Amino acid sequence: MTPKHKIFILLPDGIGLRNFAFSNFYKIGKEKNFEIIYWNNTPFQLSELGFDELKIKKAKTHPLTDIFKNVRKKIELHLNVQKHNDTVYHSYRFPDSYKTIKGSIKNCAINTITAFYSTEKGLKKIRGYIKDNERTTQYYKESKKTLKQHRPAMVFCTNQRPALGIAPILAAQDLGIPTATFIFSWDNLPKATMILETDYYFVWSDSMKNELQFYYPYIDEKQIFVTGTPQFENHFNNSNLLSRAEFFNQYDLDLNLRYICYSGDDSTTCPDDAYYLEDLVLAVKQLNEKGFQLGIIFRRCPVDFSNRFDWVLEKYKNVIVPLDPKWDRIGKEWNTMLPTAADLILQTNTIAHTEMVVNLGSSMVFDYVAHNKPCAFINYDVKNKTQKNWSVKKIYNYVHFRSMPSPKAVLWLNSPDEIASEIESALRDSRLTVCDAADWFKVINQHPAKLASERIWKSIQAIIS
């Protein structure tokens, strides 16, 4: 047997837990004789799962890194508008907050620096400042010390977004250790969310590979590995599936009903979610009057702990059954919400035992098509909007929706009056919709989808060989 190669799996935050701790990723790596150590900056105790881990203690970025990170994003979006003559990149900007003195000073600094550096040369300097500053931190020094002690063959970061990933990656590069990062989500690259600069990049698909080179032309094709994402692998693991009777009994569901899943978004993406859920309830009631026996399972966005749905859940408690995601809340920010292995099982069984999903442009379309089930996208604005300047048109104008080969990949709910008829059509025969959705799934994620972890390990092996 070949000697074991030690691979550090860097978890700068909890975002990568689902893909790289709660999937088959670890098991497959061990079967390939890798020594896997999770370099863990999350509160989650991976040792309780039987994994080897090194806890990162007191990780802290340079005081200016967050400012420069935001400057970098603003410059990239500005240059994308100019280079590609496409104003969609303006829509990825978050409005500046001036609610506190500290926030006001920070945003003034960001905007001032951005104004002076909004060129390709300026962007390159900002990227350099980030690296130079991070190399002065205690976090960088401790990371380097850890790497010298353990000498891994490679450092693989689970997410390209967090600034807390910069120092460990730089420390590895400065020691000549190969580094890689995984692009976390299908919509990340057009948003200018990438802060890590590694030796190699692991992407979902050829489409994402093209995006990576489109937005970051300094990345060579040889640095990119198309692997797919472990995000959807759980749908192909039948050991997670409960019988319909078991699932319905466990969550007090009615065996006489067929359920439709309403999948919520975060409050920024869809501030009117609760009103769309109410429209779905009214449509389901119409269908039940025609002889259908339907209910609704509501799965909220895992990072949405708000009370904005309370009124609709109470008003229609005879129709809606909420099944909250089993995520752990460690802090108030969205990236301190940690996924759990139990939630993967809940999500898989929710999909397996519902007829279809309704949402606003979510990647749940791919989770459902993995089970050969359709998705309906909401495509209208409610009359009394929570935020007057918000519109569904903004959502579907985002770049990642341009990957859709055919608009027939989903059912489009263009008004409240259309919901009942579209759902009825899907319940009677959804084969064409599912077929087109499957084609879209193949565009955004390398197939077979169940072999993503296998391809990632093969790519790691190729890099270190």
Model-identified regions with their sequence ranges:
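Donor nucleotide-activated moiety binding/catalytic core segment of transferases
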Residues: L147, V303-M364, H371
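Active-site-proximal region of nucleotide-activated glycan assembly enzymes
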Residues: K131-E134, T158, L170-A245
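Nucleotide-activated donor-dependent transferases that construct or modify glycoconjugates
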Residues: P3-I15, N41-T42, I56-L64, E76, ...
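Short N-terminal targeting/anchoring amphipathic segment
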Residues: F8, K144-P162, T354-N359
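Conserved catalytic-core segment of nucleotide-activated headgroup transferases in glycan assembly
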Residues: A21-F22, Y26-K27, F232-N335, L413
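Catalytic binding pocket for nucleotide-activated donors in carbohydrate/polymer assembly enzymes
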Residues: L196-T198, I219, S363-I444
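Conserved N-terminal ligand/cofactor-binding loop architecture of enzyme catalytic domains
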Residues: K32, I37-Y140
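C-terminal alpha-helical cap of glycosyltransferases
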Residues: P448-S465
